[in-house]
Amino acid sequence: MQILLAALVAYLIGSVSFAVVVSAAMGLADPRSYGSKNPGATNVLRSGNKKAAILTLVGDAFKGWLAVWLARHFGLPDVAVAWVAIAVFLGHLYPVFFRFQGGKGVATAAGVLLAVHPVLGLATALTWLIVAFFFRYSSLAALVAAVFAPLFDVFLFGTRHNPVAWAVLAMSVLLVWRHRGNISKLLAGQESRIGDKKKAAANGGAQDGGKL
């Protein structure tokens, strides 16, 4: 019962879509209506508003970190922490507050990993940054980071008595699945690079005074 309740709370935390909330608060178009139609920081950046993209990134990462931190703070066992990690991630992917139309989970996964262990989170984030810097594809960086995250976890903590390792693996598999469309575009040479701006509809990306 304790695990179920913790997972439910984590799912609700994950269901807060900062891309949609921040965009609405700043008078921007719904990120689900332009660009990749993904409610995430990369797509919000396509609106031309860097501040909104940064706030989205921080918010999505924070909720992942918060859910796991709360589980640890209240002394829940590792099995519960593992379920909390998966639940907050699923909340971001399929948010109950936004008709289950969520993002792809990169920032939220990063927040979860940072809460599991700072070294794990930083190693995975560094992997993303290196790939993104050299190739300028957010999706490719996310896919590579998703592959390496479980490997980093096993290297740092092993698999014995480590249920969180299975949660990390599950998140990685889900993240790759959510990027299946991006994989097709990458193979076809049609994927957008970081920094590409796609005009938003209705009060969207090219709003006056909105670009930073």
From Swiss-Prot:
Protein location: Cell inner membrane
Catalytic EC class: transferase
Signal peptide: none
Pfam families documented for this protein: G3P_acyltransf
PANTHER family, alphabetized: GLYCEROL-3-PHOSPHATE ACYLTRANSFERASE-RELATED, INNER MEMBRANE PROTEIN YGIH
UniProt key word Ion transport: no
Subunit structure: Probably interacts with PlsX.
Transmembrane segments: 3-23, 51-71, 78-98, 115-135, 139-159
GO molecular function: acyl-phosphate glycerol-3-phosphate acyltransferase activity
Biological role stated in the UniProt entry: Catalyzes the transfer of an acyl group from acyl-phosphate (acyl-PO(4)) to glycerol-3-phosphate (G3P) to form lysophosphatidic acid (LPA). This enzyme utilizes acyl-phosphate as fatty acyl donor, but not acyl-CoA or acyl-ACP.
Keyword Cell inner membrane (UniProt): yes
Membrane protein topology class: Multi-pass membrane protein
Designated name of the protein: Glycerol-3-phosphate acyltransferase
Family membership noted in the UniProt record: Belongs to the PlsY family.
Organism of origin: Burkholderia ambifaria (strain MC40-6)
GO biological process: phospholipid biosynthetic process
GO cellular component, one term: plasma membrane
InterPro entries, per the entry: G3P_acylTferase_PlsY (IPR003811)
Pathway: Lipid metabolism; phospholipid metabolism
Catalytic reactions on record: an acyl phosphate + sn-glycerol 3-phosphate = a 1-acyl-sn-glycero-3-phosphate + phosphate
Keywords annotated in UniProt: Cell inner membrane, Cell membrane, Lipid biosynthesis, Lipid metabolism, Membrane, Phospholipid biosynthesis, Phospholipid metabolism, Transferase, Transmembrane, Transmembrane helix
